[in-house]
Structure formats: C-alpha cells, structure tokens
Amino acid sequence: MTTTHDQTAAKIPKRVIWLAVAGAVGGFLFGFDSSVVNGAVDAIKDEFALSEAVTGFAVAVALLGCAAGAYLAGKIADRYGRIPAMKLGALLFLVSAIGTGFAFGVWDLIFWRLVGGLGIGLASVIAPAYISEISPRHVRGRLASLQQLAITTGIFAALLSDAVFATSAGGADQALWLGLEAWRWMFMAAAVPAVVYGWIAFTLPESPRFLVFQGKDEEALRVFKSIAPDEDSDRHLREIKKAIDEDKLAGQKGSLRGKALGLQPVVWIGIILSVLQQFVGINVIFYYSTTLWKAVGFQEKDSLTISVATAVTNILVTLVAIALVDRIGRRPIMLAGSIGMALSLGTMALAFGSATGSGDAISLPGAWGPAALVAANVFVISFGASWGPLVWVLLGEIFPSRIRARALGLAAAAQWIANFAITLSFPVMAAASLPLTYAMYALFAAASFFFVMFKVPETNGMSLEQAETLFVPKGSAKEAAKESAKESARA
C-alpha cells in the first residue's frame, strides 16, 4: 500500500535536486582532500627528508585548518551569506592545490595544507546548512545525505587520481610532466573540483532563510517559488517570519550562549553528535587493513584494490541511507548503526587480543583473521549507512535558523578537532594496546546508541521551524513566547 507520505516524497522538484547536488560539491572537496595525501605522503617524506613526527604533522595539519575554517564559516555565512562563503572556500582550496603542488620545502607545504584546510572547513559547514535550507521537508533527509555521498565519492576520486599519476610516472616520487613529480600533480589535480565548485557557487541562489533574516522577503519568496513551484511558498515564508517574531518576543538573539556549560543545549547536542561520529574510529579503522585482507589470501600489493573496494562500499551504503532516511526516519537508522558499530568493534578488539607479533608483522591466528575482516567491513557498512550521512542531516536541521550557520560551524569544528585527536593518538594507543584501542572505540559506539536514544528526537517530515521546537527546553523564554503567540492568535 502506498502512503500519502510516499506519494509526496516521490515528487522532488528537479531544481531542488540540482541545488542540493551543487551544494554537496563542497563535500566532494572534503573527501578528495582527506584522501589525496595518502598517495603522496611517502614521496613527500623522501623529498624533504622528514622525520615520522614532521611527516605526521604535515599530513594532519590540514585538520586544524579545517577546524578553524568550520568555526569561521558560521560567522561568514551569517554576515555575508551562504553563497559568498562557498566562493571563499573554493578560492582557498584552489590556492592550496596550486601552492602545495609547487611547494619548495616542508614549511610552505604545511602552510598550503593549512590554507586548504580552511577552505574545506568552510565547505563542510556551508553544504549541510545550504542543502537543509533549500530542501522540502519530505525529502530533506535524502538531499542532506548527499553531503556524505559527495565525501565518499571524493575519497574514491582521489584514490583513482593518485593511482593514475603514480602508475603513469612509475612511482609517486618520479617526474611526470614539466619535470614535476607525480605527488605534486596529485595535489594540483584538486584544482579541478575547486574551480568547478567556485563556478557552481556563482550559479546558485542565496538561501531563502538567510534572505528573510536580512529582511529581503520578496527575494526570499522568489527563491522559494523558483526551487519548488508546487510548494506553498507563502506558508514557508510565514513560518520563518513567525519563528523570527517568537525569538524577538522571547528576547533571543543569534547567540550560542546558554545555561548548559555556557552554550545552548541544542548546540551541545550537535557538538556531541559530531565528536561521537569521529570517536568511533572510522578514520583509522583500516590502519591494519592490509593484515586483515592478507588473512583471507590477498597480498600487500593488492592495497589499491582493497582501498578502492572500501571506497565503493562507502558509496553504496550511503546510497542505502539516502533511500531509507525519509522513509523510516533518522533515529531508527542511527540506533541500528550504533549497534552494528559497537558489535563489530568489540569483535575486532577480541580478534586483536589474540594477535601475535607487532607492527607490520602482526598476525591473527586461526579464524580470528577472517572474523576481524568481516567485523571491519560490518563496521564500515554500519557507519556508512547511518552515522556517516545522518549526522550531517541532523546538523543541518536541529539548529534554529537564527544560529544555524554558527552552531553548525562550532559542531563541525569540534568534529575536525576530534578527527585530529583520533588521527594523532591512534599510533601511540595502538602501540600500547591495539585490543584496548578498538575496545575504546566500541565503548564510544555504545555511548552513541544511548545518546541518540535519550537526547535526539525524530525530525523526519518536519519543517526546519517545526524541528527547532523539539529542542526548546521546557520553561524557557522561547517556549513562553510560543505560548503567548498562540494565545494572541486565539484572541
């Protein structure tokens, strides 16, 4: 039987799809940048005669730039608009791609990586904010999930381009074109998506919700009608203006400050969601992937095949999330994902508890090798179909419009810092005890289940203004203002 919801959800305006895909290109830059360095890191280390510590910092410093860019993104987007923030992100990423390709020493390479990080941080915030603000409520989950799909596609594209350059030159450290080594071309290839993203930004309309906050109601109405002509644009405009009036009545301004340790409770919810997404260890789970695949017959030389297979898996499971998120909701998918991650990480902790040897010589006896391999892939599937895309969906819709960009920026900055902390701490923790490291990630996965269970309400099918009301504390000025507005309407 087809429900009314299904019938409505099937009608997605083509222009909305285009705008969401265009906005998600920032996620492609995010994924490309996070993966492109993998094919170049060994060549960079040899080129500049770097120590392990300096090499690690040169790779990870982009994450600090991302954190700074994400934090600044909210302020830039609220002051100048979502589209100018996109253009700035594209410009920074373009400059970084060219600068890194022509780096003459490790310190200017680090500088250009930092600049690129600023651009990626901007893009990581603006994409989910923009997509959520232009998407109809019945398909917002699917369209917002395009951010994660773009990230995984960017990772896949970077893996392929790295392989093409390295193979063509006979190695990442070998000269390819114009006397420049292949690793330099790997970074300069990022200029292509940066230019595309910048060009797209010049074709996109500004977020209608930002326009309303700027007092440009007529322009906002035109944007609403252009992106979804079958929707009730006047009603959307009234809902946004009503939310603004309620905020004014409650004396609330665009501040993140609150009584919960200095921040509003909803801001903490966004920060904790972001941190948990990283603290389950997704970015380091395949640190020993070669060992796992060797346990079932693969050779070390098959690492590219392994990486590509993982990237394709990420893309496919993200498509599953896109198909389900507006049908069954955010909470059920995230809760199921948390269970899958906790169980698979726990299995990996047990498997590595029986390991012999250390470092590259580590081995898993008997059935533990295949068990760990299966568990690692179950983890990737569980994460990719739930917490990977849906955290971005929630970050785009749980924050009130007056603070959305800044709150999303702070949450994304926390995510990048958590990513940096996990990336730097994993080698040290793994050397001390790999089983305990995976057990710690399993505990964070279990914690993610209870956090969603008790702190994250369902937002499926709601407008952004309706979703905002789910996070209003009882007895707050905002709630009082809403009740006052209702009484005035009755009178």
Model-derived features: where do they sit?
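Transmembrane-helix signature of 12-pass secondary carriers
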Residues: 1-491
